[in-house]
Amino acid sequence: MKHNLTIDIETFSDISIGKAGLYKYAQSPAFQVMLFAYSLDGAPVQVVDLMVPGAYLPQEVLRWLFDPDCVKHAYNAAFEWYCLSRYFKLSEDEHHNGFSAATWLQQWQCSMLHGMYAGYPAGLDATGKALGLPQDQQKMSIGRSLVRYFCTPCTPT
C-alpha cells in the first residue's frame, strides 16, 4: 500500500533566495532546516523544532521519508526536496547505499503544480482565497513578515 507524507519546512540561510536562487541559498554553510512539519496519510500535523538542542526527526518519519513506496507531497516540492537533500547530505549523482537525490526526486509530488494544472494561482495565499477556504485555514497574513524575521539574517542596528 502506498503511503503519503505531506511535508512543509522552514529554513534559514544567510543568502537571499530571491537574489541568488534556491541552489545558492541551500548550499550556504549557514543553511539550516529549522522546522519540519509533516502528516502521514492525513493524520494530524506534527511539527519538529530542529533548533532545539538534541532535536531530531522521529525514526518513523525518516523511514517514510526514504521509503520509495511513500509519496512525498509539498507545496513547491522542489524547495523541500532540494533543501532536505542538502540537509541529509544526499549527492545529486552518486548513490549512497543505493540512494541519491536524483532518485529521491521521483518520489515527490508538488501540490502547487497540481493546483496550477487545475487553474489555480501559484501563490499559497492566492490559492487559499481562490479555493474559498475559511480565514483560519488560509496562509497567515503575517506569514511573510515572520519568515523574513526568523529565516533571513538581520541587519545590525
In which residue ranges do the predicted regions lie?
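Entry/capping segment at the start of metal-dependent catalytic domains
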Residues: 1-31
